[in-house]
Amino acid sequence: MLLSRAISVLALLACIRCGVHAQNTEQNLKTQLTTDSAMITSQRLLRTSVDFKDSEERWPTESSRIRSAIKDYFREFPEKVSIAMAIRQIDAHGVRHVEKVLSQYKFPAADQGNIRLAIIHHKAPK
């Protein structure tokens, strides 16, 4: 065991002295830098190509604040959520946010039905 370890240390020293190991490391480093810069560029492109209509990725706090307000509004009333109440929320915050709240949170079946009817009513051609 000691002999095999000594041989591997001598082989490593010989490679380092000849420069073979250093050249290989330099090539690997160049490849690694190229790969890293390509990854950074692609991430930057993804970050800057966000659709401004769906600004969730850029400003998640604003969207989550709106959705939290919608959720709290619907859960505030012990009685059934009416279609008119859902339409008011759609007019105030937009259909996309109300749909997202409906998909993320659980509401009683009657409330879900009324909210869906309000969304359908809002999306229907006038």
UniProtKB/Swiss-Prot annotation:
Q: For this UniProt entry, what's an example GO CC term? A: extracellular region
Q: What is its main location?
A: secreted
The residue ranges crossing the membrane are: none
Q: Where in the cell is it found?
A: Secreted; Host cell
Alphabetized, the UniProt keywords read: Secreted, Signal
Tell me what induces its expression: Expressed during host plant infection.
| Keyword Signal appears in the UniProt entry | yes
Family statement drawn from the similarity comment of this UniProt entry: Belongs to the RxLR effector family.
General function of this protein: Secreted effector that triggers a hypersensitive response (HR) in 3 Lactuca saligna accessions (CGN05947, CGN05310, CGN05304).
Domain text: The RxLR-dEER motif acts to carry the protein into the host cell cytoplasm through binding to cell surface phosphatidylinositol-3-phosphate.
User: What name appears for this protein in its UniProt entry?
Assistant: RxLR effector protein BLR31
Q: Which organism is it from?
A: Bremia lactucae
